[in-house]
Amino acid sequence: MKEAGKIFSVLSDEMKTFATLTIRDLTKSFDKQHFANNHISLEIETAKITAFLGHNGAGKSTLLNQMIGFTKPDQGDVCYGDISFVQNRKRARSMMSYMSQQYAPLEKLTVEQNLEMLGRMRGLNTLDLQKEMDQLLTELEIKEYRAKQGKDLSGGLKRLTSFAMALIGSPTIILLDEPTNDVDPIRREKQWQLLQKLAHKGHTIIIVTHNLLEVEKFADNYALFNHGKLIKSGPVQQITYQKQYQISFEFRNKDSLALFQDYTIINGSICQIEIEEKELTRLLPKIKQELDRKNIFNLSLAQKNMSISDLYREELTN
């Protein structure tokens, strides 16, 4: 056990010299017809929280399993610097922690025993282990349950224990699959705050989630998947800083609506449209022309910032 901890420590120190976790042309098919992951390439920033988004079955969990080496890709690689995780799966597991959607705590071990087991595997000495356990249990507000066995915990407490197990020992790369499911709003926020602290210390964090509001509030980057393909990726702020406009007006006949690709008709003759700033700039002269001709009237214009939810709907419903 001491030797395993020593190796983990050495690898963690070595990791600090590398800039990015890189996914290169990663491909996986389980039935030779449908791709779980279809030629995915992505660079994931160090010291950032990256959220993997997409519908159920989009390939997010499969991607995490390939990254840590539980599933072997049909082709492609996952690298950290010059280290290939596909070629050396043991090394990948030494450098990463992984929280799956299933509950991790062993049923007959207490919360504390589960954490202690993982902490010792990751090389923590007794003093540091106790300190980290106390800190995690306190910050997640589950200290009072430390002596409870896994089988006696509620779903939310099992999820929080699994989360703490992924964080104990501060692995350099942390993979989390829907870690806030079943967790109450107060503790969910504390989970994200812990992840932000780790990211600020230089850790690479990847989280699969369907909670888009939390992504906007806490994540640095996003990657959006659909049917096994990477659709779009980038900084969250790049999306939320984009201006979007909501236009409402009444129309005399539907011919005026030919200007717009997408619109919603409310109460018969009232139309509502949401468009981005560049599209509004293009359409303004034509809208003015329709106003002058009195084909449309009672025009109102409201500005708002685009959200991750807007991006999600736009990319996955077209």
Describe every region a protein language model picked out.
Residues 116, 120, 127-145:
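Conserved ABC ATPase "signature" region
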Residues 194-274:
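ABC transporter nucleotide-binding domain
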Residues 68:
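Helix-to-loop junction immediately C-terminal to a conserved catalytic motif
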Residues 245-315:
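Short, charged/small-residue-rich alpha-helical element at the C-terminal edge
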Residues 76-87, 91-92:
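Conserved ABC transporter NBD signature motif
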